[in-house]
């Protein structure tokens, strides 16, 4: 049996970029190691959730790990909160949130200039309203998670986040009668937090420095903790997660995986790429399954920066050299969780390239790992197929039937 390393480059898929004379960032990147893996791979295209579906990183990671989003997904908030180490109990409602910059009632920047440290702000806006305790914890850059703890709460509420700039933050609405209390308390929380943020020393200092204040919390993705089957019970694989992204850590934590903490694991473009794959090489000796998430490709896509996306891919390509000589003992899977084309600055419904690489498998005659070359491979799959194929190629699957 072989151990499995699943590398997910978040938002990997792209469209042709004029900056690269019609190539995608992946095609334009210098990627000798990824191409070498491709020559020892079964490869093709994957729809993370389904054809044409613009999946989020939450639903796509669930799908790739073999958990149907239709069954297990009820909101992103719980995963974000768990990934930040927050405790959630039955009846709690969790949200993901952005610190944003609002002026004259309009959202001018949903990321408040990609503010790097919001811990003081999160402590300041954690509060109690009526019989509900509201805890805010900062994530990477502008991101945060919010947990509501108290009686009679519901996740059936709308977002305050308009999901685009030059729009007003929205009033939270109950989506059914049982959610009226939750919506009322959330709207009061948003009002009070706005007053606190506008007067907070962190934001006053930022304005004096000519920076955007983080003076609004945009809330979205309400949910309660789903009952996710333990990964080991499901696949009999001892699993570990390497990621600087709270969402991914939260999904993997809920699935019972070990979360690996490392120095300089940022979840940003300035990632510790070399350290990640050194750690993966070390962990592959004692874990059956390792998932690695690289967030920088997605960040660059959202920022419409194909040059940075190419650079992230090249950094990954260089660092992956630490494990590509272990193909006698490893099955290495490389893919994205969705496409984030730089010309769109958002997720698209396009499929992503995927390859399953190891020695002694029926490799396809594909020389390059990119969105178009892998069309000549043998695979056209969905995310829910990945673990089944991985178990088969690693000689871990069980026979179906007599």
Curated annotation (Swiss-Prot):
The keyword Isomerase applies. Residues 155-174 are annotated as: Disordered. Its EC number is 5.4.2.12. It catalyses: (2R)-2-phosphoglycerate = (2R)-3-phosphoglycerate. Keywords: Glycolysis, Isomerase. It holds the Pfam family PhosphMutase. One of its GO terms (molecular function) is metal ion binding. GO terms for biological process: glycolytic process. Residues 160-174 have a biased composition (Basic and acidic residues). The keyword Isomerase applies. Catalyzes the interconversion of 2-phosphoglycerate and 3-phosphoglycerate. Belongs to the BPG-independent phosphoglycerate mutase family. A-PGAM subfamily. This is 2,3-bisphosphoglycerate-independent phosphoglycerate mutase. The gene is apgM.
